[in-house]
Amino acid sequence: MTTSLPFVLANHGFALNFNVFETNLINLVLVIALLVYFLKGFLGGILERRREAILADLKDAEERLVTASKALEEGQRELAQAKSTAEKILAEAKQRADLIREDGEKRTIEEMARIKQDANANLNAEAARVIEALRAETARTAIDKALAALPKRLNDAKRAELIDRSIEALG
């Protein structure tokens, strides 16, 4: 059953009722006025408490923001100090490593020089021993040859003269 707007207007009519008593307008105004009067304090109290809670939350949030900002600044300061300390430690470590490397190089050079001196001393000692051995062998060979040739070269007169000179040299 569909009814159209023109049908409703034609049969029932459309009009505004301005009769205050029939429309309950007075009752509505009274009820609304009483609700506003009595609920004003109730709703106002609720809204005031809510406002105070929001303000307290805002104040707490601001305090936490200030605290967090201070903590952040302190953390950044400590981070900068830690970076500075780390850079100093790194620089000292590099310097110490360079000193250790230089000391190691110096000790290596000194040890090489000492080994070279020891080798030269050993070589000189061995050369002196070989020279002494050669001298002794040469002297022994010369003495042997001289002793072998001596009987052929010496006669009795020269032998006696040699003995006399040797005795005088000793004596």
UniProtKB/Swiss-Prot annotation:
InterPro entries listed in its UniProt record: ATP_synth_B-like_membr_sf, ATP_synth_b/b'su_bac/chlpt, ATP_synth_F0_bsu_bac
One Pfam family from the record: ATP-synt_B
Keyword flag Ribosomal protein: no
Cell compartments where the protein resides: Cellular thylakoid membrane
Transmembrane spans: 26-46
Keywords, comma-separated and alphabetical: ATP synthesis, CF(0), Hydrogen ion transport, Ion transport, Membrane, Thylakoid, Transmembrane, Transmembrane helix, Transport
Membrane topology: Single-pass membrane protein
GO MF terms, alphabetically ordered: proton-transporting ATP synthase activity, rotational mechanism
A Gene Ontology cellular-component term: plasma membrane-derived thylakoid membrane
SUPFAM superfamilies in the record: F1F0 ATP synthase subunit B, membrane domain
Keyword Signal applies: no
Assembly and oligomerization: F-type ATPases have 2 components, F(1) - the catalytic core - and F(0) - the membrane proton channel. F(1) has five subunits: alpha(3), beta(3), gamma(1), delta(1), epsilon(1). F(0) has four main subunits: a(1), b(1), b'(1) and c(10-14). The alpha and beta chains form an alternating ring which encloses part of the gamma chain. F(1) is attached to F(0) by a central stalk formed by the gamma and epsilon chains, while a peripheral stalk is formed by the delta, b and b' chains.
NCBIfam families, alphabetized: ATP_synt_b, PRK07352.1
Record function comment: F(1)F(0) ATP synthase produces ATP from ADP in the presence of a proton or sodium gradient. F-type ATPases consist of two structural domains, F(1) containing the extramembraneous catalytic core and F(0) containing the membrane proton channel, linked together by a central stalk and a peripheral stalk. During catalysis, ATP synthesis in the catalytic domain of F(1) is coupled via a rotary mechanism of the central stalk subunits to proton translocation. Component of the F(0) channel, it forms part of the peripheral stalk, linking F(1) to F(0).
Entry similarity comment: Belongs to the ATPase B chain family.
Name of protein: ATP synthase subunit b
Organism of provenance: Synechococcus sp. (strain RCC307)
